[in-house]
Every structure is written in structure tokens, then in C-alpha cells.
Amino acid sequence: MTMPKSCVCRKENVMKQIEKLMDYRQSIRLVDATLRDGGLVNDFYFTDEFVKALYQTNIKAGVDYMEFGYKASKEMFDVDKFGKWKFCDDEDIRAIVGDNNTDLKLAVMADVGRCDYKTDIKPRSESPIDLIRVATYVNTIPAAIDMIEDAKNKGYEVSCNIMAISTAQELDIRTALEMLGKTGVDIFYIVDSYGSMYPESLARLVYFYKEIADKYGKKLGIHAHNNQLLAFANTCEAVGDGVDYLDATYSGMGRGAGNCQIEPLIAFLHNPKYNVYPVIKFNEEYMEPLKESGVKWGYDLQYLMTGLLNQHPRTAIAFTQEGRKDYTNFYKEVVAQD
């Protein structure tokens, strides 16, 4: 008996969906940003035991990049008020990783206007670092380009992470990406700093980014915040839209509402190179005690409010630190600022 054409089509569509669910892109790169974004929560005071365990866990879990922290200026920031991962000296990284004879690559972030990159970032041949992530706003792109070219000339992989992208105008974004496309930068990063984006708005932005990235042969990355409980959903959306570099953190640790959690993301990617068990073990042995010690991050109403209004979470962070619970008053305050 011949199967009706409509049934054949439905069966083919079902099989395509099953294949999509079971398939994975080999170009995906998973970036652990726990120390860097999580360091904003505890001023980068992680013990060496914690950092070594995180490094070993990333290796076992198949994570592609581990971001150690910032390359912040010691002239601008008091070294006595921050842990070592605010500054990421090469010797401190080597004390953790040795020669790093593994597949795990190492990254640091350098903020425009907050680092002495010409002196503090050594040539790649002298450093354990593989990737320099240049953080900028859309209005500081010329300074970012100078940093990008400096890092490329020193032999590094380089990304450009344009922060607070949800507040930028499309014409400004296009101009910035066209300027960046003509540099040696390897990756354009979409950064939802305020956790204000939804999957559909992110999809439109990725399409826009990808048009220019493809023109210049660049890769795309995503860094999501969890103010509206959408960091994981937005990262998954980005994967489906062709983004390759995915930032995530253990237990979602990060400034304010935190970031995309690495645990469900590993499961979502369907790639046999990734192993979620070491991540679960690290969470049990290190992240849960860190929470119990009083270090706070994660979704709460105050972060939802700033995300809804596309505002920087600094007011919500202050609300949390002050131990306030008057959410309705806080809502009135942030609406008045909008």
C-alpha cells in the first residue's frame, strides 16, 4: 500500500526535527566566564583551590575557553581592594595552569579605558593567554580598534564585546561593525548587558550582526544576562541563529542576576565532547559552599525591573546590598529614571 504524499511529508518533517535535535555544530565554542563575570560579585576573591578546581573541571567537561578575569590597570584600580583575577598577571595564571598542555584555551578581558594594554599584555609567545576579549561601548570603537590591533600584532585571538547593545541605535551598531570588520578581530560579540532582550529581538540582532560578520569573515559570540530569566533561552536562540561562541558560567554566577548557566547549556548542545558530570560535581563542591558563604547573585525582582526597563543593574545591585525588600517603591524609583 502506498503512503499518501501528505503523510510522507509529515514523516520527513518529523525526521528533520529529530535530526536537528540530535545534531550539533562542530564550530560551537563554549566559554566559561565564571571567574570574570562572577568576580564582579566578590571582587575577584577566589581561592587558588577554587580556581585550580575550576580549571580542571573545564578540562574534564570539554569546555573550549576559560576566562580568568580582567587585565585591569593597577594605576586605576587599587590592588589591595581586589583579588588577583581583576588583573590577571601572567605569572598568576601560570601558577594555576602550568604550561597548559591541554585543549582548553585561556582568555582575559580588557576594558577600553581601564587597562594598560600596551605594557600589561605581553606578546603571545611570552604569555599563557590565547584570547583577548576587548570590551567596549559602541561610542568607544576607535579606542577598541587600537586595542584589537595591538593584541593581534602580539599574536592573540581577539574578540570585540560591544556592551549594552540593547541601548545602541542600529545605525551606530552598523557603523561600529563595519569599522571592526576591517580590523583583525576574530569574533563580534553580542552582549545583552542589561538582560533586557527577548529571543525574537535577539534573533533580529543576530541576523543584523551576521550579515556584516559574514561579509568580513568574522565569527559571532553571545553573552547573556539573566534579569528576565532569559539568559539560557537567548543563548539557545543564538545557537539556532548561527552564533558560535557561547558565554556561560557555573551556576549562572555573574553580576546582578547572573549569566547563562553552563549546566543546561552543555546538555542543550548535544555534543559528545562536552560532559556535564564534572560541572555538577564542581557545583556541589564549590559553588554551593560559595553561596552559603554569603556571596549573592541570581534572579530577583529588582533585577527583573531594571531588565524590563533596559537599565543598568547598578540600582538593583545597590537595592540588594542594602537588604531592601520594598519592591514597589523600587519600581517607582527606576520608572522615574527611565
Where are these regions (language model features)?
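Catalytic cores and adjacent flexible loops of soluble metabolic enzymes
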Residues: 7-338
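Methionine residue identity
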Residues: 1-3
